[in-house]
């Protein structure tokens, strides 16, 4: 089939690679002059299937209200004039029940675990360099209440057979020796030895090169105008004077999929949740993390690359605003300085922001849309890289009419009615 993929982030590029590998003729359209220059550019650097969990969790509405009053809050809201913001938040809060959380987390873990399997096969086949590490990830708890609350997540991990280690403070230092330098700040942790880390930007660039070898055509600086329908079916993409005919169109536009598809009558529940990161040069390897640690209090991840440290996190609801907020810089700097004060040079940090495409229930949209010929691969939130390989393979199998390795139940737009 002739397939057009919209979007050159990690999800779009990985989808294009799988589709080309399956024998399809693929064209990828991207408005920037290269791949992974927006949301995939400087994310937290983790592939964490075990931590695949919705932001919509029991207790979040009350926590969110408290966070609004905190200086280093992990979640903030900047009201906009767009009524979609309020509708999205109400839908998110409606998913904060224990029953909804269990269903949503189960769906996310199913896709994320499958994605890790796909990632391993992909890595073995291609041998690409993205500063990857397979040393697990460690969630850090600063209070006993946080440690006790992790039992709910452990139940889901056990249900899906995800290996884990529940650690005390000494165990955390054993997993991440540099934490011994700040002894007394951590009461325990949850380690997932199967999780991975790496640079998503480097990965996406390498995957784009591999996709080109398979014949994928990349069209950059291409501002997409509309999807053309014929008798109710998506048949082409228009971009200025160019028209790209397609048997199937994959929308992997991240947060921008919502507005782009609205003229077609599709109401995607995908909202841009703004995240921030710092990337600083590592100056002392022994004082730096070995892999990724996640500070549960501030919802900040700290990831070790070869010679750099990436600090990422925060969730800000402020629409499509890409302005850099210095307060978020200060929070990220505070967290890395608190846990790894001698690891990197914060004075030389690169400050970045991106918009994560988030659904109210946390589960992405992977599969067919109500319009024949139009397929969705968006809404992955903070887990775009974690789920990219699995989402790409699953979507490829669905488009190709092949048997799928996992069920797509609950992963499509159909769950929203």
Curated annotation (Swiss-Prot):
Oxidative deamination of D-amino acids. The gene is dadA. Pathway: Amino-acid degradation; D-alanine degradation; NH(3) and pyruvate from D-alanine: step 1/1. This is D-amino acid dehydrogenase. GO terms for biological process: D-alanine catabolic process. GO terms for cellular component: cytoplasm; plasma membrane. FAD binds at residues 3-17. Belongs to the DadA oxidoreductase family. Keywords: FAD, Flavoprotein, Oxidoreductase.
């Amino acid at each position: 089939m002739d397939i057009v993929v919209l979007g050159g982030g990690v999800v779009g590029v990985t989808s294009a690679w799988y589709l080309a590998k399956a024998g399809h003729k693929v064209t990828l359209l991207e408005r920037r002059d290269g791949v992974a220059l927006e949301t995939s550019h400087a994310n937290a650097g983790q592939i964490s299937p075990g931590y695949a969990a919705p932001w919509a969790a029991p207790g979040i509405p009350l926590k969110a209200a408290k966070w609004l009053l905190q200086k280093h809050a992990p979640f903030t809201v900047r009201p906009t004039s767009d009524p979609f913001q309020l509708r999205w938040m109400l839908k998110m809060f409606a998913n904060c029940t224990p029953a909804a959380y269990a269903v949503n987390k189960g769906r996310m873990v199913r896709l994320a675990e499958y994605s890790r399997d796909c990632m391993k096969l992909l890595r073995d086949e291609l041998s690409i360099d993205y500063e990857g590490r397979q040393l697990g990830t460690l969630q850090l708890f600063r209070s006993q209440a946080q440690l006790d609350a992790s039992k709910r997540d452990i139940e889901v991990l056990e249900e899906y057979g995800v290996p884990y280690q529940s650690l005390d403070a000494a165990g955390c230092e054993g997993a991440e020796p540099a934490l011994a330098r700040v002894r007394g700040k951590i009461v325990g942790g949850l380690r997932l030895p199967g999780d991975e880390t790496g640079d998503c930007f480097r990965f996406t660039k390498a995957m784009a090169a591999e996709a080109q070898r398979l014949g994928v055509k990349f069209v950059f600086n291409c501002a997409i105008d509309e999807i053309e329908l014929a008798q109710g079916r998506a048949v082409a993409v228009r971009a200025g004077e160019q028209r790209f005919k397609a048997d199937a169109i994959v929308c992997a536009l991240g947060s921008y999929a919502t507005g782009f598809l609205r003229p077609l009558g599709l109401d995607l529940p995908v909202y841009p949740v703004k995240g921030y990161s710092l990337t600083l040069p590592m100056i002392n390897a022994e004082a730096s993390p070995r892999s990724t640690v996640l500070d549960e209090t501030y919802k900040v991840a700290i990831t070790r690359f070869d010679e750099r440290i990436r600090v990422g996190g925060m969730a800000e609801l402020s629409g499509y605003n890409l302005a850099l907020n210095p307060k978020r810089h200060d929070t990220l700097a505070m967290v890395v300085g608190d846990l790894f004060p001698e690891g990197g040079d914060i004075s030389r940090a690169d400050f970045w922001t991106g918009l994560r495409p988030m659904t109210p229930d946390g589960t992405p949209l992977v599969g067919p849309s109500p319009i024949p010929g139009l397929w969705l691969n968006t809404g992955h939130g903070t887990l775009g890289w974690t789920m990219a390989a699995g989402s790409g393979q699953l979507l490829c199998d669905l488009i190709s009419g092949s048997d799928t390795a996992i069920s797509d139940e609950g992963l499509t737009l159909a769950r929203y009615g």
